[in-house]
Amino acid sequence: MIKQIPNIFTLINLFLGCIAVVFALQTETISIYVGDDLSSHYNIPEKLSLASYFIFAAAVVDFLDGFVARLLNASSEMGKQLDSLSDVVSFGVAPSIILYQLLRISFIKEEDGLQTSIAWLLPAFIVACAGAYRLARFNLDNSQSFGFKGVPIPAAGLFIASFPLILNFGNSFVDVSPWLTNKWVLYAVIILLSWLMVSTLPLMALKFKDFTIKNNLPKMILVVIALLAAFLLQWLAVPVVFIAYIILSLLYKQQPS
C-alpha cells in the first residue's frame, strides 16, 4: 500500500490537469466595439487564469510525488509511466489549450478576425506533441539524474501557464501584454519551446548533490534571480526565471549524468 502513495499524488496531478483543461476550454473572449470599429480593449477571460492556477497546483503535486517516492523508497516503473501520462495532460495539453485561446484572442484583435480559420490556431498543440515526445525519450534514458536533455515539460508548461496571469495582473515595470497577444510572438514561442523540449541541449536539473558553492553555483544564482524576480515582477518572474534557467544551463554546460 505504501508504494501506491506516490501514485496517488500523481493521479492528483492528472486530476488538476484535467480541471485546467476544462477551464481553458470554457473561456469566452469579450470584444468591445467603438462604433463600427473593434476597440483595442479586450479582456483575458478569468477562466483562462483559473486554468493557469490549476497547472501551477499540478506542478506542486508533481514535485511532491517524486519527493514522496524517494522518501518512502517507493519508486516503481508503473509510477514512472503514470507520471509521464499525467504530465502530458497537465503540462502539455492544458498549456496548449491556453496558447490556442491566446492565438484566438490575437486574431480577434484584427480586422475580420472573427473569420479566422481554425487552422491558424491548431499549431498551439505542437507544444503538447513535443512534450509527449520529450517524456517518451526521458522514460527510455537513464542518464538524466542530475541533468536534462532538453527542457522538461513541466518547465515549458509553467512558462505558458504564466501568460494569462501576466495579462490579468501585469506589473509596475513593463507592459508585455501586446507581445503575449501578438500572433507572431505566440507562433515563435510555440516553435522555440517545442524545439527546446525535443532538443538534446544539456540543461541542469534542480537537484543539489551537496550544498557547496562550487558544485551548485548556477542553481544558487537561479534561486537568487527567482526570489528577486518574484518580488519585483510578480507573475512575469516565471518567464524571466525560465529564460535565466536556459542561459545558466548553457553557461555552466554540463552533460546529463
Question: Where are the regions that the model predicts?
Answer:
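C-terminal membrane-associated helical module and adjoining short loops/tails
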Residues: S145-S257
